[in-house]
Design a protein with these regions (language model features):
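Terminal amphipathic helices with adjacent charged low-complexity linkers/tails
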Residues: 3-4, 67, 71, 187
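Conserved inter-motif catalytic segment of the P-loop NTP-binding fold
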Residues: 83-117, 124-128, 232, 272-281, ...
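Basic, amphipathic alpha-helical bundle interface domains used for macromolecular binding and assembly
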Residues: 129, 151-349
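Peripheral, non-AAA+ core regions of ATP-driven protein-machinery
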Residues: 1-55, 63, 170, 309-310, ...
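Switch/coupling sub-region of P-loop NTPases
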Residues: 30-43, 52-54, 89-155, 160, ...
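Walker A/P-loop
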Residues: 57-99, 164
Length: 349
């Protein structure tokens, strides 16, 4: 106010702020080239990025799950102006935008601690409702490390936003709906001690303990995660080889090509990527060869898949075909998509 008074009196002129020019910012410090080995996991993350699919990584401590997850934004398409406006509104309500950053210029990457409350995850609070981690991840990535360590009620708050792309926070004073279309990336150990299936045989957990640990993630929640990928320990031979791995830039080029295919396919439908495909669009948008159809039919019966799991496999297969530049989903595309449902397979053991 004092500055305004001096300006009106002519004692001190307020200089205009330079206009904000929107451009995307991409941190250069995190690159997939830094990660030795784990080619199968990188492939799964590339598929997830290409179709905006949710992914769960399962592996022992030190296998690189967190390292890989933190590099996922480096292969995602640039944030568009429209997406930035949507996400910036959420951050503005949360009071997380500063004077020198009136808009987000990079995709959000949120990684809440496993002690976060249901309110912290979904939003709410006393008085004015505030967006939670779910909405702060809109148009970006929500990374949940050590997934079974999160409280069950916190994990379950994700179920509806994963389906609807929005979350409604209801309080006595009223309700508020925030957007929440994000990529969910989860990481977990295979058991409580972390070493089930490890070549060293270090696991000390009983079969019942392992089952109880995995039951912390409900079946309906697992159904909503498109890809389940095992992350093995990296052997010494790969660690000592300091030859740079494939860069994020190269992977991002393939992701962008696949996203461009999806953009043209879904133009005017309100759908932007394969993960958002609606049930009524599946038949026309996911044509299968006869061999692929028979494979999917056999997998449905053999794995005891739910209808939701079947649809998610089909969406992942659609993305794999897009990465290959092919219109029809082949047997190879379907087989690769099926192998990313490892927890469905293990449920039969």
């Amino acid at each position: 106010m004092a500055q305004l008074t001096r300006h009106l009196e002519g004692a001190e002129l307020i200089q205009p702020e330079p206009p904000f020019q929107f451009h995307t910012v991409r941190p250069d410090s995190l690159d997939f080239a830094d990660v030795m080995g784990q080619e199968s996991v990188k492939r799964a993350l590339e598929i997830a990025a290409a179709g905006s699919h949710h992914i769960l990584m399962i592996g022992p401590p030190g296998s690189g799950k967190s390292m890989l997850a933190k590099r996922l934004p480096s292969i995602l398409p640039d944030l568009t102006l429209e997406e930035s406006l949507e996400s910036s509104k959420v951050y503005s309500v949360a009071g997380l935008l500063g004077r020198h950053q009136p808009m987000l210029q990079a995709r959000p990457f949120r990684s809440p601690h496993h002690t976060v409350s249901a309110v912290g995850m979904a939003g709410g609070g006393a008085g004015r409702t505030r967006p939670g981690e779910i909405s702060l991840s809109h148009n970006g990535v929500l990374f949940l490390d050590e997934l079974p360590e999160f409280r069950r009620d916190v994990i379950e708050t994700l179920r509806q936003p994963l389906e609807d792309g929005q979350v409604t926070v209801s309080r006595i004073s009223g309700s508020c709906t925030y957007p929440s279309r994000f990529m969910l990336v989860c990481a977990m150990n295979p058991c409580r001690c972390g070493y089930f299936g490890h070549p060293s045989g270090r696991c000390t957990c009983s079969e019942q303990s392992i089952r109880n640990y995995r039951k912390k993630i409900s079946g309906p929640m697992l159904d909503r995660i498109d890809l389940h990928i095992n992350v093995p320990s990296v052997p010494y031979e790969q660690l000592k080889d300091r030859k740079p791995a494939e860069s994020s830039e190269r992977i991002r080029e393939r992701v962008n090509r696949a996203r461009d295919i999806q953009k043209r396919r879904y133009a005017g439908t309100g759908v932007y990527c394969n993960a958002q495909l609606l049930p009524g669009m599946m038949r026309d948008c996911c044509p299968l060869t006869e061999e692929a159809r028979l494979l999917m039919e056999g997998a449905f019966d053999r794995l005891g898949l739910s209808a939701r799991s079947y649809d998610r496999i089909l969406k992942v297969a659609r993305t794999i075909a897009d990465l290959a530049g092919e219109e029809q989903i082949s047997e190879l595309h379907a087989a690769e998509a099926i192998q990313y449902r490892s927890l469905d397979r293990e449920a039969l053991l």
